[in-house]
Amino acid sequence: MMQQTSEIIQAPYLKRYYAPASTGNFSVGFDLLGAAFEPISGELFGDVLDIVAEQAELELELTGRYVHQLPADSSDNLVLSCFYAFEQTLGRSLPRLALRLHKNLPVGSGLGSSACSIVVACYAFNDYFGKPLSDNQLLQLMAQAEGGVSGSVHYDNVAPSFYGGLQLMLPDSAQLCRALPWFAHWRVVLCYPGTVLSTKAARAVLPKQLSLTLSIAFAGMLSRFVSALYSADEAEAVAALRDLVAEPARTPLLPELPALRAGLAELGVLHLGISGAGPTLFALCHNDAQAQLAAEYLARHYEKNQDATTQICRLSATGARAL
C-alpha cells in the first residue's frame, strides 16, 4: 500500500526550509554518484526545518511521520550538532533559535535520511544568517557532518540533496561535484519496506580492497554510464547500470532483491537497484505508466509494515530550498 509520507504540522514560523530524499551510488557509482528525487504528486518527500523564533537558548521540537525513529532526547540530534558546527566554522557566536524539524524520511532507510537533516539544517542556518558560507564551504560542512554519522566522509547524499539533480562527485577537485544530464521521461520508484538497515552495518560487509580487475571494471562501467548520459543514449546508459562493488556484498542483507528484479523485468522496468545502503530499492522506469506498475508491484511484494512507503518520483531539479 502506497502511503503519504509528508506530515507538516500547521504552526507559526519565521522561515521554513526543505531538503529532498536522495539515492546514493545509483548502482553504478559507489560513493561517486547520487541523485535527489521528489514525488510526481508534488508531495514533500524529505525533511522540513522551521526556524520558529530567536530566543535565549537553542531548542528543537521534533515532529513528522518518522519522528518515532529518532532519539527521544532531542539534544542528541543532527540539527543541533549542525548549528554548533556552523557556528564554529564562522568563528563567532550566533543568536540561539527555536527550531522545529519535520522528520518525514525514515532513518536507516537508504534514502539519505541523515544527509537530509544535515542539508536542511546547514542550508537553513546559512540562509537565515545572511549566507556567510559559499556553496562549496557549506557542502564541505555537510559532508563532514555526514561522515560523523556514517563513519566516512562522502558526498553522494549531501550533494544531490543540496543541489538537486544527478551529481557526480569530483575527487581532488575544487568543484566537488557536477550535475549530469538526465532523461526527462525517466521515473524512479522508491520503495522503503519499513525495516532499518544502518549505513555503518551495510558498509561493514563491503570488501576492504578491490582487485585490479574489479577496479578496472568498476571505473569502466561508471565511465560508460556517464558517457551514455552525455550522448543521450538511453539504452547504453541502462546497460551500464551495474553495481559491481556494493550489491554483491549486500545482497545477503536484502535476500528479496533477485526475485523482485526478475518480477519487475517482466513488467519492462529498466533497472532495479539498492538505494544507498538499503533497504530501500529504486526502480528505474521509462515513463509514468511503467512507474505505476512498478510501484504497485513493489508495494505488494516488498513493503513489510506501517512504516513502509512507496513513491513514484522524478529527479529533483532544485534540491534544498526555502519554502
Mark where each language-model region is.
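ATP-binding N-lobe of GHMP and related small-molecule kinases
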Residues: 2-109, 123, 127, 131-133, ...
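Short, small-residue alpha-helix embedded
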Residues: 115-130, 278-284
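Acyltransferase
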Residues: 180, 184-262, 266-267
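Glycine-rich, charge-dense phosphate/pyrophosphate-binding loop(s)
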Residues: 229-323
